[in-house]
Structures are given as C-alpha cells and as structure tokens.
C-alpha cells in the first residue's frame, strides 16, 4: 500500500473521497466513500464533470496498482487463476454468503494463536499460509498490506488494538475482491476431513486448535503416535519446554463407551449423556497425576466399543470473542454449575475433584500456574549447564592470571640479573 500512487495522488484521492489519511488502504471504506461521492459528483446529479473524471481515474489506478502488488512478487504458487478488472466486483463476503463469518475464522480462540502450525482451511489460516509462501518462494523479506492480506500485515499497517482486531479484520477482508486474495475457495468450502483410521477408532481426540500446534510439532515419532493432518494430538509426547511456555493447548476427548463410574459423574454433573457418548474435558498438563483407568472405567461386561458412525465436519460454535461480528445471531451461553464436593469420597477422588475444579473453572489461573511450574522446571534443567559454563570461565581466568604472573616474575628475574652484570 505504501507504493500505490504517488504522495500527491494519494492526498488528492483521499480529498475527493473525504476520508482521513489513516484510512488509506482500507478498501471497504474507500469503496463505500467512492460510491457516495460518485452520486454527488455525477453530472446528471448536478456535480462537476471534471471532478468526476478525476475521481474515476484515480480510483481505477488505485485498484490496478493494488492488484499488481501481488503480481509483481512473481506469483504465490497457489495456482489460483487471476481475473481481469471486470471480475473484481465479487467481494469475499458475497462469495461465501451468510456463512462468511464462520468460514472466515473456524475456531477464533485458537486460529489466532496458531501462527506457524495449522492445517485449518478457514480464510484467516489460509492467508497466513500465503504469508509464509510469499516469503519462501518469492524471496520477499518484508511484506506490507497489499502484497499480503494476512492478519499480521493488517495489524502492522493499521496498528489495530488487539481487543477489536478480529471484528475489524473480518470486515476488511469481507469487502476485498476475492480475486485479490488468491484463495482456493473450494478448500474453504470443503475443509480437509480426518483420516479413516481416526474415524474408526474407539476414542477420537478433537483439539481446540485447528491444526498442528507448536507442542504437537515437537512430538517425537519414536516416542508416540504422530499427529494427523487434521490436528489430532498424539497419545504420548515428548514435550519441549519452549513450546509449552508459548503455546499451551486444551483438548476434548470423545469416548464412545458406556458412561464412567460415579466419580466422573460427580465431577461433571452438568454433562448430558446422549446414548452412549460423553464429552470429557482434559488438560494436557496438570499438577496432579492422571486418573487411573480402574477408577474411571471399571471392568464390566457391558463395556463394548461401538462402531463410530460417519460424521460430518462441523464448524466450532462462535465464542464470546467472535460474537460481535455475527449479524443478529444469538448463541446461548452454557455456564456449568459449580462443583459441590460430596461425602464419601476417598482422598484420591477429592484430589481429582480439586484439580478439575481449578482447571475448568479458572483456566487463566491454571494456565499461569502451569507456566510458572514449567518455567521453574526449565530453570532447574539448565542450572547444571550454567554452572559448568561459569566453572569453565573461572578456570580460564585463573589460568590467564597464573600465566601473567609467571611472565612478570620471569621479567623481574631477568632485570635483576642484568643489574648484577
């Protein structure tokens, strides 16, 4: 956007559109202002023919230059066919219709976090993939808005506050011509389905992330199952401490078996049992050990795994962060009732109850405590290495001082002998 039109032409176009300078590059607002000024400056409406011609010329040049910003980089490698100027009237919101906001960001709370590792097919994640594609294949070290339309480039250009960035960014992309984004519309309409092996498994893990998180990317192949393409976590992991500090995740396990024992029902009294299915919230890291299988799932002749039916990919319900941009759609908020301890629980069951209560009803406190505990573990792990480095520097300094003292002593002896002669 900084190389579109000269400075004088920019100021003249904004003057004709009657927009402030900070809105330069906001295509939606500029296009709306252009339509309003076209009605006022049209000769048939009593406007000036010269001003109308100048406005049309500057506006056409602006759109052509923005279109050429991406083309001048040498292509994106997405093999999306570009249209001519006649096909720029179709905006992104018109392309996806009423479900634009759901397809724009499939899982708002996690798509914003997964910057590098994501296999999601929403518009937000696909534009982020284009950013990496442009840097790798086009050797573009610094990208600005216009060359790339990802969230980071948008925030860097407009300096948008974090609280409202998703709402403003969704409206910004909504009015953008779909042809300028180089998006594969088919992949947005038809996201990648999970593999058949995972569909036939008795227990299927669904993550709140839409793809590979930093923690899943560090999973060792020899230390557990490899994460699937749809973002399914491995059963056992060797976690790297920097990844845990930067990207804690939460998972949801769908267990297709008979309901657990009374302990789990006391912990989660608000969960509705439908047929033989129950949703159990889990946390990847906990201060206490995991619940033993014999406590949650006692041996029973009725515990027979049922075949998993074919499921349709559904989009995640919008959270509070994303409700503001939904046009007139009200989503009921499900507030789980507080956990009430019951008499007759063993110390182990009470320990599990307190852990789940802290993890699920105070996630911010739980995340901060887990991060502090992990940070302390990292410091202890690297303390020996720091001690060895300090010892090496100390030995080197002592050796240097001993050599310097020996040289000084040798010079003193030579000077003393020379005086005797």
Swiss-Prot record:
InterPro entries: DnaJ_domain, J_dom_sf, Papo_T_antigen, Papo_T_antigensf. It is found in: Host membrane. Its main location: host cell. The modification Phosphotyrosine is found at residues 250, 315, 322. The keyword Membrane applies. Interacts with host Ppp2/PP2A A and C subunits; this interaction alters Ppp2/PP2A substrate specificity and localization. Interacts with host Src, Yes1, and Fyn. Interacts with host Shc1, Plcg1 and p85; these interactions lead to cell cycle progression. Interacts with host 14-3-3 proteins. This is Middle T antigen.
């Amino acid at each position: 956007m900084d190389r579109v039109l000269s400075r004088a032409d920019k100021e003249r176009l904004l003057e004709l559109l009657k927009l402030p300078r900070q809105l330069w590059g906001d295509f939606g607002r500029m296009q709306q202002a252009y339509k309003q000024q076209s009605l006022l400056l049209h000769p048939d409406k009593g406007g000036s023919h010269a001003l109308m011609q100048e406005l049309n010329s500057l506006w056409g040049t602006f759109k052509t230059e923005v279109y050429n910003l991406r083309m001048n980089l040498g292509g994106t490698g997405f093999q999306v066919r570009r249209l001519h100027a006649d096909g720029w009237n179709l905006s992104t919101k018109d392309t996806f219709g009423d479900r634009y906001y759901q397809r724009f960001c499939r899982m708002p709370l996690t798509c914003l976090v997964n910057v590098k590792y994501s296999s999601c097919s929403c518009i937000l994640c696909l534009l982020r993939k284009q950013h990496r594609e442009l840097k790798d294949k086009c050797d573009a070290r610094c990208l600005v808005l216009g060359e790339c339309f990802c969230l980071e480039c948008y925030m860097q250009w407009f300096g948008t506050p974090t609280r409202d960035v998703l709402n403003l960014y969704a409206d910004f992309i909504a009015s953008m011509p779909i042809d300028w984004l180089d998006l594969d519309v088919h992949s947005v309409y038809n996201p990648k389905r999970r593999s058949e092996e995972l569909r036939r498994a008795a227990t299927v893990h669904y993550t709140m992330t839409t793809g590979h998180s930093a923690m899943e990317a560090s999973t060792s192949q020899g230390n557990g199952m490899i994460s699937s393409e749809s973002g399914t976590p491995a059963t056992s992991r060797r976690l790297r401490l920097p990844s845990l500090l930067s990207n804690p995740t939460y998972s949801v396990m769908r267990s297709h078996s008979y309901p657990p024992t009374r302990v789990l029902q006391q912990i989660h009294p608000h969960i509705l049992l439908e047929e033989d299915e129950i949703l159990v919230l889990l946390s990847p890291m906990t201060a206490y050990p995991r619940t033993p299988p014999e406590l949650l799932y006692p041996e029973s002749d009725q515990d027979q795994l049922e075949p998993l039916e074919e499921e349709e990919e559904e989009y995640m319900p919008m959270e509070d962060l994303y409700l503001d941009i939904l046009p007139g759609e009200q989503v009921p908020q499900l507030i789980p009732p507080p956990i009430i301890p019951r008499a007759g629980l063993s110390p182990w069951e009470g320990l599990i109850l307190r852990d789940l209560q802290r993890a699920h009803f105070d996630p911010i406190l739980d995340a901060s405590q887990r991060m502090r505990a992990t940070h302390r573990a990292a410091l202890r792990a690297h303390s020996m290495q720091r001690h060895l480095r300090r010892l090496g520097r100390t030995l080197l300094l002592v050796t240097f001082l001993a050599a310097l003292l020996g040289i000084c002593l040798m010079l003193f002896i030579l000077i003393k002998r020379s005086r005797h002669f």
